[in-house]
């Protein structure tokens, strides 16, 4: 009889398979189960020679093969399939066993599973895993949350297989309930913003300087040696430069209709519910929706050719490229600032006590948004933990101050020439709104009071005191 294994994994799609192989590489024995026995058999045939893998065709045998407390990682489609799998496992589990959902589950679903399984004596962990296929195989960024009692038993496994940066694993305990999956979702939302900013930057360079895919790819490659060094800038350079066997640019064949799996929309909705102005992430989600209207956009382009105010390209190409680089970096700061504002707000609302600086360290390796920039964020939270946002931390204040002129020039060029830049323009608008002392929003309150008697606060009175004006007759104001 084979010895019991260290951990079990359910779901042998790409992410599941690569996580298993990563665990085996780090000396852990793994039991695997897939609803399709053929997939399990094929996986064992390809990778079972080490003896560290065991495959099973029934849930009961799978569970019985594990060392106690049993540690089971579920890597299947989010939603109802996860609940169905948990229900099928429960009859064979014992108090103290650990269930880990490593998929892209919505954090409120994870909160409910945490509560429900705690009643059964089962330790539930909602674990965000970022890095895609390559990260899962070579070292992902891992964000575990849920029942803290599970952490001592699973930490040796997941901190071993996680990406390592400066000798530190990109994996640490996040918080209770759905904290792990929420942090992963915000990561994905920030990723949406990063990608959209890169796309808009590409479009400005292409339109205003008439540059080729390869030329812009080379610019991105150069930028990747600067403060903008990141996985996504490097990936964008690689995609733009790549050629097929005939020497043609592969990127030129890709249809401009962008897909999404829903995590960006979740974060946009969560930001609105939390009252956090996460405008870049929201705009990046909307840009993908607009991209799906390909036929409508094609017709609209014929009906509305546009009336550009800027017809001539910039006089100094190199200076303009630097303006665009500054715009990208400034907008990236604002995007991350918004993301961390949401993390901070929801952490306060939920009582998670998230360590925001630690999150920046977890994201430095193995994940899609990994970048040198995250070190600056960690340092910022270490040096100025009381700051309302990244924007008010010393390093980022200086960057925004130094890059503001180039940022504005790049946005002016784009808008003046009819280039859609929803995230870059949103970033600049947020920056200007954030630093505005007296905004026009007083008129919102005046109008709400005019048509709905909602009341308003006065500039010359303490906050929290509300007043109503009889706008239609006496014009008298009184406290309500």
From Swiss-Prot:
Residues engaged in binding NADP(+): 11-16, 34-36, 76-78, 104
Pathway in which the depicted protein is active: Carbohydrate degradation; pentose phosphate pathway; D-ribulose 5-phosphate from D-glucose 6-phosphate (oxidative stage): step 3/3
Keywords tagged on the record: Gluconate utilization, NADP, Oxidoreductase, Pentose shunt
GO biological process, one term: pentose-phosphate shunt, oxidative branch
Top-rank EC class of the record's enzyme: oxidoreductase
Superkingdom as given in the UniProt entry: Bacteria
InterPro entries, A to Z: 6-PGluconate_DH-like_C_sf, 6PGD_dom2, 6PGDH_C, 6PGDH_Gnd/GntZ, 6PGDH_NADP-bd, 6PGdom_BS, NAD(P)-bd_dom_sf, Pgluconate_DH
Keyword flag Cytoplasm: no
SMART domains found in the cross-reference section: 6PGD (SM01350)
Reaction catalysis annotation: 6-phospho-D-gluconate + NADP(+) = D-ribulose 5-phosphate + CO2 + NADPH
Molecular function terms from GO: NADP binding; phosphogluconate dehydrogenase (decarboxylating) activity
PROSITE patterns: 6PGD
Entry's EC annotation: 1.1.1.44
Cellular component terms (Gene Ontology): cytosol
Pfam families: 6PGD, NAD_binding_2
Active site per UniProt: 184 (proton acceptor), 191 (proton donor)
Positions of substrate binding: 104, 130-132, 187-188, 192, 261, 288, 448, 454
Subunit structure as annotated in this protein's UniProt entry: Homodimer.
PANTHER family according to UniProt: 6-PHOSPHOGLUCONATE DEHYDROGENASE
Similarity section: Belongs to the 6-phosphogluconate dehydrogenase family.
Function noted in UniProt: Catalyzes the oxidative decarboxylation of 6-phosphogluconate to ribulose 5-phosphate and CO(2), with concomitant reduction of NADP to NADPH.
Protein name per UniProt: 6-phosphogluconate dehydrogenase, decarboxylating
Species assigned in the record: Chlamydia trachomatis serovar D (strain ATCC VR-885 / DSM 19411 / UW-3/Cx)
Gene designation: gnd
């Amino acid at each position: 009889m084979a010895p019991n294994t260290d951990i079990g994994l359910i779901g042998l799609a790409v992410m599941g398979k690569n996580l298993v192989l990563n665990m085996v590489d780090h000396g852990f024995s793994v039991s695997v189960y897939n609803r399709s026995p053929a997939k399990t058999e094929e996986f064992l045939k390809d990778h079972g020679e080490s003896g560290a893998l065991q495959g099973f065709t029934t849930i009961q045998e799978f569970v019985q093969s594990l060392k106690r407390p049993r540690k089971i990682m579920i890597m299947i489609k989010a939603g109802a399939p996860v609940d169905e799998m948990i229900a099928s496992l429960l009859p064979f589990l014992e108090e103290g066993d650990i269930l880990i959902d490593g998929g892209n589950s919505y954090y409120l679903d994870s909160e409910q599973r945490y509560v429900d399984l705690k009643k059964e004596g089962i330790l539930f962990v909602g674990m965000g895993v970022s890095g895609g296929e390559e990260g899962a195989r070579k070292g992902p960024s891992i964000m575990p949350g849920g029942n803290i009692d599970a952490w001592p038993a699973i930490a040796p496994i997941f901190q071993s297989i996680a990406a390592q940066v400066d000798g530190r694993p990109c994996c640490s305990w996040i918080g209770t309930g759905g904290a792990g999956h929420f942090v992963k979702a915000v990561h994905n939302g920030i990723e949406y913003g990063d990608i959209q900013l890169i796309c808009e930057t590409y479009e400005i360079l292409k339109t205003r300087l008439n540059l080729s895919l390869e030329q812009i790819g080379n610019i991105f490659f150069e930028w990747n040696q600067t403060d903008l060094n990141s996985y996504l800038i490097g990936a964008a350079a690689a995609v733009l430069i790549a050629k097929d066997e005939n020497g043609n640019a592969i990127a030129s064949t890709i249809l401009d209709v962008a897909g999404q799996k829903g995590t960006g929309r979740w974060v946009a909705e969560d930001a609105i519910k939390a009252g956090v102005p996460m405008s870049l992430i929201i705009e990046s989600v909307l840009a993908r929706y607009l991209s799906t209207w390909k036929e409508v956009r094609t017709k609209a382009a014929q009906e509305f050719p546009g009336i550009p105010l800027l017809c001539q390209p910039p006089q100094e190409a190199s200076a303009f490229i630097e303006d665009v680089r500054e715009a990208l970096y400034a907008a990236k700061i604002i995007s991350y600032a918004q993301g961390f504002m949401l993390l901070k707000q929801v952490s306060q609302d939920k009582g998670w006590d998230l360590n925001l600086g630690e999150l920046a360290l977890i994201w430095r390796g193995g994940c899609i948004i990994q970048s040198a920039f995250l070190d600056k964020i960690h340092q910022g939270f270490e040096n100025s933990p009381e700051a309302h946002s990244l924007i008010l931390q010393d390093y980022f204040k200086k960057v925004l101050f130094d890059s503001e002129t180039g940022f504005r020039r790049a946005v002016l060029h784009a808008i003046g020439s009819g280039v859609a830049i929803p995230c870059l323009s949103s970033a600049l608008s947020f920056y200007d709104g954030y630093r505005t002392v007296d905004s026009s929003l007083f008129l919102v309150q005046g109008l709400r009071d005019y048509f709905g008697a909602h009341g308003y606060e006065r500039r010359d009175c303490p906050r929290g005191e509300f007043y109503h004006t009889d706008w239609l007759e006496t014009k008298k104001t009184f406290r309500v």
